[in-house]
Curated annotation (Swiss-Prot):
This is 2-C-methyl-D-erythritol 2,4-cyclodiphosphate synthase. Binds 1 divalent metal cation per subunit. Pathway: Isoprenoid biosynthesis; isopentenyl diphosphate biosynthesis via DXP pathway; isopentenyl diphosphate from 1-deoxy-D-xylulose 5-phosphate: step 4/6. Homotrimer. The keyword Magnesium does not apply. The lineage of its organism: Bacteria, Pseudomonadati, Pseudomonadota, Betaproteobacteria, Burkholderiales. It is an enzyme of class 4 (lyase). Its EC number is 4.6.1.12. Involved in the biosynthesis of isopentenyl diphosphate (IPP) and dimethylallyl diphosphate (DMAPP), two major building blocks of isoprenoid compounds. Catalyzes the conversion of 4-diphosphocytidyl-2-C-methyl-D-erythritol 2-phosphate (CDP-ME2P) to 2-C-methyl-D-erythritol 2,4-cyclodiphosphate (ME-CPP) with a corresponding release of cytidine 5-monophosphate (CMP). The record marks 38, 137 as: Transition state stabilizer. It comes from Bordetella bronchiseptica (strain ATCC BAA-588 / NCTC 13252 / RB50) (Alcaligenes bronchisepticus). PROSITE patterns: ISPF. 4-CDP-2-C-methyl-D-erythritol 2-phosphate binds at residues 12-14, 38-39, 60-62, 65-69, 146.
Amino acid sequence: MNIPFRVGQGFDVHALVEGRPLIIGGVTIAHTHGLLGHSDADVLLHAVTDALLGGAGLGDIGRHFPDTDQAYRGADSRVLLRAAFDKVRAAGWAPVNVDATIHAQAPKIGPHAAAMVANIAADLALDAGAVNIKAKTNEGLGYLGRKEGIAANVVVLLARAG
């Protein structure tokens, strides 16, 4: 059966720590803490990357860009996202739209959402209207509510290319 669409789902979470920049959706946000990770720890772009790869049946971000590989230490997640996009296109798929939710007690995501949308749209060759970003707090509950980390959930619709 030749199904013309696939859905990919991605999730990522990183701890907030002192002494690192906070980068979400390729946007550096002024904040007291940043996300801990092997790369730049961009929780949103990691979830988008996982959703793309998963939807195309290509595994996940760890398979293609392992945190055990020093080549990816401090890597710009936009570079990783574009590389994943190339792999997805080579497999015969193209993203149609991206819907993301960022879970963060702080900082406020709203003032930065348009820049995040623009980055993702540019990296995936999409119209900005095909990328949606929502933000939720955890109402003070759990590790996210205690400001110990930030998480992101992403859904991507893929269509057969060409």
